[in-house]
Design a protein with these regions (language model features):
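An acidic, Ser/Thr-enriched
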Residues: 78-119, 131-136, 141-301, 456, ...
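Asparagine-centered strand-capping/turn motif at beta-strand->loop junctions
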Residues: 54-58, 68-70
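Short, solvent-exposed beta-strand/turn "edge" segments of beta-rich domains on protein surfaces
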Residues: 37-47, 54, 131-137, 498-500
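Von Willebrand factor A/integrin I-like adhesion domains
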Residues: 360, 416, 432-472, 476, ...
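N-terminal, polar/Ser/Thr-rich
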Residues: 1-43
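Short, charged loop segments at secondary-structure junctions
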Residues: 101-112, 269, 293-309, 321-331, ...
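Aromatic (phenylalanine/tyrosine) cluster motif
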Residues: 633-634, 646-650, 660
Length: 662
C-alpha cells in the first residue's frame, strides 16, 4: 500500500536505452515532511486540495516520481509545484505532446513536472518531477473534485483514498498499454514512507443542508458545528492518522432525500461547456411495491485470489452469507469462485433456492478462503454470459472483489455488451479496493456498487443491494424540460440514467445562459406502472463557483461514459473536452515547466531523467498474492545493492513458468 511515498533516481543517469530490469541506476527515497489536506463539502460535491512537502536529502539532482490512488469519478483539474519558493503551474495538454514537452525540458536541465492518469485504470494518478536539486524542497499541490452520494443508511460518504495496493496483470492483457515509463511503488519499497511526517486534515461542510451528525468509523475527528447546524469545521489531530486505510467521513444531513437542484453559472468569456450554465439534479425516485419481483436468477461471483487474504476474506464471507440468507423463495441462484481458475457450486447451472440448495451453499461458504491464486476475473464472467438467462427470470450478477486488477476496460466492455440481459452489482471489499473496477463495472452493467469494510453496517448495505437487485428494470426512461426559449438543453452524458427506487440519482444538464428552466420531469415504465417525478424551476438554487465544480464533474461523468464504450471512436471528443475543462483523462496530461530558473548543470547527452523508460511490466503486476508481496519487499530491502539483478531473475522465473500466484 502506498503511503504518499516519493522516490527518485539520478537525473544524470541515462535510462532510455536499456531494459528496465538491468537499468544501471540508483533509486533513492525522497523524504516526505508533511501532508496537508483541505476538504470543502457543499451538499453533494467535494473539493480536495492536497499538499505534499518533500525534501531531497541527497546531493544529486533527481527525477522523482510517485503514484497515488484517486477515486475513479474524481475530476483532477489542477496541479502546482512550489520548488524552493518558485511556483510552477501545470496546464492540460494532449498526452503525447505533454510527455514531449516534459522530456525536452528535463533533458535541457529545467525543472518540470508531469501528471498523468494511468493508461489502464482511472483510479491511479502518476506524477514525475524532473531535476529536483540536491538539498531542495518541493511542495506538490493537487486539486480534485468529487460527487458524493447518499448511501443506504442516509449518510453522505466522503472517502479520501490513501491505500494503493498492487494490481494483478492477467495473462491476456497487453502490458504495453500500461504506463511503461512509470516506476511504480510496488517495485520499490523505498517509496513506501517509513520516516515520520506530519499529517493535517481540515474539512468544511456547508451548502444549505442542516446537519444531523458527522462521524468516522476509523479516525478520531474534532467536529465544530455552527450554532444553526448549517455548517461545520472538521479537523484531525496531527499525528493521529495511520495511512493503512482509506480516510472516510460520514455526513448525515437532516433531510438527505429531499430533491436538490443547483444551477452553476458558466464562464461567459469561455466557449463550449464552460460557457453555458450547468444544472446538477439530485433526486431519490420512489417506485411502487409491484416493481419488485421474486423471479430472479442471482449469480454470486466471489474473488478468492491471494490479495483477498485476511480481513478482506472475512468481510467477503460475511457479506456472502448475508446475501445467501436474504434471497427470496422462488428465485434461482449459483455461486462461482475465481482466482487463477474458477469453479461453480452448481456446475450444470443455477438451481432453485430451497433449504437443500441453501445448505450446499453454506457448506461452500464455510470452506471459502483466499487460495485460488491470481485474479482472472474475465473468464468466470464469460462463462456466465455464454449461457442465456433462465426463461422468465431476470438475471443478476453480484460480484464480490477487491478489484485489484489492471484489465478494467476488458471487464467493463464485456459487462456493457451484455447489460441488456444481465445486470451487474458489485461489492468492493476492503481498503484500497479499485474504484475503477467496482464503480466502473456496476455502471457498465446497469447496476449499483457498494464499498464495504469490517466496521461497516454490512446488513444494511446488503439489504439495500438485495432490494435493488429484485427491482424490475425501469424501461423507457426519459428526461424532459419545459424551458424558455425552447431547445438547447443537453444531458451530460447523453446516456439516459438507470433508475433504482430510493437510490440517489444525479443528473447533469447543460443549459444555455439565457434559458429559463420552468420544470424538469423524469419518467419511465416499470412493469405495468408508469412513474414520473416532476420538479419546478422555482426549486433551483443558483450559485457562482470560481472552480466550476459542477461543470468539471459533468465533464468527468462524460469521460467515464466514453471509456465504457469504444474509446477510439470518441478520442478527439474526449481530448477536446479534457482540454476545455482542464479535467485530466487517459489521453491528456498536466505539464508544468520552470522557465524562469537557469538550467540545472550541463545538458545531458541523452534525455537523462526523462520518465520515458522502457518498463514493460512492473514486478507487482505479475502477482496478486499478499504473501509474495511481503517476501519481495523483505528481499529487496536486504539486497538493495543488487536490486536490478534480483528483479530480473525473479520476473524471468515467473514469466517462464507462468507462476502468477504462490
Amino acid at each position: 500500500m502506498a503511503r504518499w511515498g516519493l522516490f527518485g533516481y539520478n537525473s544524470a543517469t541515462d535510462v532510455t536505452d536499456q531494459p528496465w530490469f538491468v537499468q544501471p541506476r540508483e533509486v533513492y527515497a525522497v523524504t516526505l515532511k508533511a501532508v496537508d489536506i483541505e476538504v470543502t463539502i457543499r451538499g453533494f460535491t467535494a473539493r480536495v486540495d492536497a499538499s505534499l512537502t518533500y525534501h531531497n536529502d541527497t546531493d544529486k539532482a533527481l527525477t522523482v516520481q510517485y503514484s497515488m490512488p484517486v477515486d475513479e469519478g474524481a475530476a483532477v483539474y489542477k496541479f502546482e509545484a512550489v520548488v524552493d519558493g518558485r511556483k510552477i503551474t501545470a496546464q492540460c495538454f494532449e498526452k503525447k505532446r505533454a510527455e514531449q514537452i516534459y522530456k525536452d525540458a528535463v533533458s535541457s536541465g529545467h525543472t518540470a513536472f508531469l501528471g498523468r492518469e494511468d493508461n489502464l485504470t482511472a483510479d491511479i494518478f502518476h506524477l514525475a518531477l524532473g531535476n529536483l536539486l540536491g538539498g531542495s524542497e518541493a511542495e506538490l499541490k493537487l486539486s480534485l473534485l468529487m460527487e458524493l452520494k447518499v448511501k443506504t443508511d442516509g449518510a453522505v460518504s466522503f472517502t479520501l483514498p490513501t491505500v494503493l495496493n498492487p494490481r494483478y496483470c492477467p495473462k491476456d492483457v497487453d502490458a504495453s498499454h500500461h504506463n511503461t515509463d512509470i516506476v511504480t511503488p510496488f517495485a520499490h519499497p523505498e517509496s513506501v514512507t517509513s520516516k515520520p511526517y506530519t499529517f493535517g486534515l481540515k474539512a468544511k461542510v456547508q451548502g444549505g443542508h442542516a446537519l444531523a451528525n458527522i462521524v468516522s468509523h476509523h479516525d478520531i475527528l474534532i467536529v465544530k458545528p455552527s450554532d444553526d447546524n448549517m455548517s461545520a469545521e472538521i479537523t484531525q489531530e496531527c499525528g493521529r492518522f495511520k495511512p493503512d486505510h482509506d480516510w472516510n467521513m460520514l455526513i448525515y444531513y437532516q433531510n438527505p432525500y429531499k430533491t436538490h437542484i443547483i444551477r452553476e453559472k458558466g464562464d461567459r468569456s469561455s466557449t463550449g461547456l464552460m460557457k453555458d450554465d450547468l444544472l446538477m439534479v439530485n433526486l431519490h425516485p420512489e417506485l411502487p411495491e409491484q416493481s419488485y419481483s421474486h423471479r430472479n436468477e442471482v449469480i454470486f461471483v466471489v474473488d478468492r485470489s491471494g490479495s483477498m487474504q485476511g480481513e478482506k476474506m472475512q468481510s467477503a464471507r460475511t457479506t456472502l452469507l448475508l446475501f445467501l440468507k436474504s434471497l427470496p423463495t422462488g428465485c434461482y441462484f449459483n455461486v462461482i469462485c475465481f482466482g487463477s481458475t474458477y469453479s461453480l457450486l452448481f456446475p450444470s447451472g443455477s438451481e432453485e433456492y430451497t433449504e437443500q440448495t441453501l445448505e450446499k451453499a453454506l457448506e461452500l461458504h464455510h470452506s471459502i478462503s483466499a487460495d485460488m491464486g491470481g485474479t482472472e476475473i474475465l473468464q468466470p464472467m464469460k462463462h456466465i454470459y455464454s449461457t442465456p438467462p433462465k426463461p422468465g427470470f431476470a438475471r443478476q450478477i453480484l460480484l464480490l472483489t477487491d478489484g485489484e486488477v489492471f484489465n478494467v476496460d476488458q471487464v467493463k466492455e464485456l459487462v456493457s455488451r451484455h447489460a441488456h440481459e444481465t445486470r451487474v452489482f458489485v461489492v468492493g471489499i476492503g481498503h484500497g479496493a479499485s474504484t475503477a473496477l467496482v464503480h466502473g463495472v456496476a455502471r457498465a452493467g446497469h447496476g449499483l456498487a457498494e464499498m464495504v469494510y469490517q466496521q461497516d453496517k454490512l446488513q444494511l448495505k446488503v439489504m439495500g443491494l438485495v432490494r435493488s437487485m429484485l427491482q424490475d428494470s425501469v424501461q423507457d426512461v426519459s428526461v424532459t424540460f419545459d424551458v424558455e426559449p425552447p431547445g438547447g438543453i443537453k444531458l451530460i452524458p447523453k446516456t439516459l440514467p438507470i433508475i433504482f427506487g430510493g437510490k440517489h440519482l444525479i443528473l447533469y444538464v447543460r443549459v444555455p445562459t439565457s434559458t429559463e428552466v420552468k420544470s424538469i420531469t423524469v419518467s419511465g415504465v416499470v412493469g405495468n406502472n408508469k412513474i414520473s417525478n416532476c420538479f419546478n424551476g422555482s426549486d433551483i438554487v443558483n450559485i457562482h463557483d470560481e472552480e466550476k465544480t459542477l461543470h468539471r464533474l459533468a465533464a468527468r461523468a462524460q469521460i467515464n461514459e466514453w471509456q465504457i464504450d469504444n474509446e477510439e471512436d470518441v478520442a478527439e471528443e474526449m481530448i477536446t473536452l479534457s482540454l476545455a475543462t482542464g479535467v485530466v483523462c487517459r489521453r491528456t496530461a498536466l505539464i508544468g515547466v520552470d522557465e524562469d530558473r537557469k538550467p540545472v548543470g550541463p545538458k545531458p547527452e541523452s534525455a537523462a531523467g526523462s520518465p520515458m523508460m522502457d518498463l514493460s511490466l512492473t514486478p507487482m503486476c505479475m502477482t496478486s498474492m499478499s504473501f509474495r508481496v511481503c517476501v519481495m519487499y523483505f528481499i529487496l530491502i536486504r539486497i538493495d545493492s543488487d536490486l536490478g539483478v534480483f528483479i530480473y531473475v525473479y520476473i524471468c522465473k515467473s514469466w517462464n513458468t507462468e507462476q502468477y500466484s504462490t
